[in-house]
Design a protein with these regions (language model features):
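Alpha/beta catalytic cores of nucleotide-metabolism and tRNA/nucleoside-modifying enzymes
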Residues: 1-7, 12-151
């Protein structure tokens, strides 16, 4: 039987999705990219003239107190002050509707597929080519020496 492989964590850009799928992932978890959207749980607040939305990772103490402790093998712990956090709570920039983010992620994935000549996601896995670059090279490959005013 085939084991399903899910890339969980570290997905920040559409290229990360393409790399995970090319490496063999069947799915990706991209919860942090959706945090701050209208569809994500949490309240919207205004701080310093900007909008933010509360964020609570499933491994945070607050989430475990609300019932996620069993996911982290801590549900048998009766003294909730002894929970060990595997997530955080805080605020993220308010992003509006999730559709905008999904549109950009799909567009970026299509672009990555185009670079590899892959018409379908399964084609990404046929001949993936991974090139190791340094951290400096990574930052050099991003937009630099410019103040981005609009994406």
């Amino acid at each position: 039987s085939k084991t399903t492989l899910i890339a969980d964590g570290g997905i920040k850009f559409s290229g990360d999705i393409a790399k995970a799928l090319a490496a063999g992932a069947d799915a990706v978890m991209i919860g942090s990219l959706f945090a701050g959207t209208d569809q994500a749980p949490g309240r919207i607040i205004k701080r310093g003239g900007k909008l933010f939305k509360s964020f609570r990772g499933m491994g945070s103490i607050g989430a475990m107190n609300k019932g996620s402790a069993d996911r982290y093998f801590q549900s048998k712990q009766k003294d909730t002050s002894k929970y060990v956090a595997e997530g955080v709570e805080g605020f993220v920039k308010y992003k509006g509707t999730v559709e905008k983010i999904i549109y950009q992620l799909v567009g970026g994935l299509k672009s990555s597929m185009g670079y590899l000549g892959a018409k379908r996601i399964k084609d990404l896995r046929k001949k993936p080519k991974f090139v190791k670059i340094t951290k400096a090279g990574f930052y050099e490959s991003m937009v630099h020496n410019i103040d981005v005013i609009k994406k």
